[in-house]
Amino acid sequence: MIKLVLLRHGESQWNRENRFTGWYDIGLSEKGETESRAAGELLKKEGFTFDVAFTSVLKRAIGTLWNVLEGMDLMWIPVFKNWRLNERHYGALQGMNKAETAQQHGDEQVLVWRRSYDTPPPPLEKNDPRFPGNDPRYATLAPEEVPVTECLKDTVDRFLPLWNDEIAPMIRSGKRVIIAAHGNSLRALVKYLDNISEEDIVGLNIPTGVPLVYELDDDLKPLKSYYLGDQEELQKAIDSVANQGKA
């Protein structure tokens, strides 16, 4: 049986401030540092080990992975960083407070922007300082690959080539894999693995810093999935994510 571990980064400073983060490269909060170290300790306690790791090019995910691997004494394993694992791009909402945005536009509209499958937030202008085309880490991307906004469908579309071309073949070869990424890039993968409908994906919330284990068959189809850790605390964390976009 194959086990794949998914981990949303620990709480970031902008998670703490309830701001839309997207591709903005903000670091972990003190709580996020603690969450990510605890995730590493929990994975080690539960007997997990890894041969290879994947993460995004954003430091909140990279830092989370470092803390996990340090706690597991696995800092020597190969780590692949790829922009396709970035959080979805929140367009012109990036940096804005979620509750204040809900007060301005209404809870229902913000829920659509945050959680719907195919409705992106308002786009950035390309002359906006927040436009990722100005960032050297994306210099090798084709112009059409650099987003000005994204919905979850866009995130799925840009993530799946990485899954199909790199991650899935590595899992099939017998490598034990951990993916440390973001709420929406992981929602994209969970939607794909579990074949969740466009309507039902709205209700899926992934908490920060809690390992999500997928047990897969040889065709990489899920047999079951579960979070590690205290289930009561887990539900509180999921509810907290769900309530972030409310006025």
From Swiss-Prot:
Keywords assigned: Gluconeogenesis, Glycolysis, Isomerase
PROSITE patterns in UniProt: PG_MUTASE (PS00175)
Domain of life: Bacteria
A biological-process GO annotation: gluconeogenesis
GO MF, one example: phosphoglycerate mutase activity
Catalysed conversion reaction: (2R)-2-phosphoglycerate = (2R)-3-phosphoglycerate
EC number, UniProt record: 5.4.2.11
Residues given in the record as substrate binding sites: 8-15, 21-22, 60, 87-90, 98, 114-115, 183-184
UniProt cross-references to SUPFAM superfamilies, sorted A to Z: Phosphoglycerate mutase-like
Metabolic or biological pathway: Carbohydrate degradation; glycolysis; pyruvate from D-glyceraldehyde 3-phosphate: step 3/5
Active site residues per record: H9 (tele-phosphohistidine intermediate), E87 (proton donor/acceptor)
SMART domains the UniProt entry points to: PGAM
Site feature Transition state stabilizer, where: H182
Annotated function: Catalyzes the interconversion of 2-phosphoglycerate and 3-phosphoglycerate.
Family: Belongs to the phosphoglycerate mutase family. BPG-dependent PGAM subfamily.
Protein name: 2,3-bisphosphoglycerate-dependent phosphoglycerate mutase
